């Protein structure tokens, strides 16, 4: 069953190791899946739709569009120039006081489209300026500690 899940439901296919232990006369199978350097790995849901997840404290959390953009940008072979405009300054101003900022609140307060906000946050996450924080089953963003 583990082999079928790794091959049929994961894109790209994930590698794993299996170990068997005998505990109190019962056989225990431990499957270990190491973190892959090539992200994201998509898992198909019940309808066949591919979804990407993050592993946080033994929980599988659905990846946000920002995570997907960070991974997409990281796989790009060429670099990307960041222009420092009012939009970038506005984001830094929003995060300046150490407050946690949600994507929705950022869009509302700045009037940016969701797509533009995702793109900008992904760039800042990719370059270690901003970090995602998972709190109360929701992602927020803050200036990354040095």
Regions found by a protein language model. Give the residues of each.
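Conserved N-terminal catalytic/coupling substructures associated with nucleotide/phosphate chemistry
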Residues: 1-146
């Amino acid at each position: 069953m583990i082999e079928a899940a790794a091959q049929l439901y994961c894109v790209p296919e994930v590698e794993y190791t299996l170990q068997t232990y005998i505990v109190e006369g019962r056989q225990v199978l431990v499957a270990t899946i190491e973190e892959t350097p090539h992200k994201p790995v998509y898992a198909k849901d019940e309808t066949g739709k591919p979804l990407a997840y993050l592993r946080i404290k033994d929980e599988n959390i659905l990846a946000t569009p920002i995570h997907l953009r960070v991974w997409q940008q990281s796989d790009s072979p060429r670099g990307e120039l960041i222009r420092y405009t009012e939009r970038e300054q506005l984001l830094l101003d929003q995060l300046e006081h150490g407050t946690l900022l949600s994507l929705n609140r950022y869009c509302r307060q700045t009037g940016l489209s969701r797509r533009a906000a995702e793109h900008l946050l992904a760039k800042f996450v990719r370059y270690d300026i901003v970090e995602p924080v998972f709190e109360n089953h929701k992602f927020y963003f803050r200036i990354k500690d040095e």
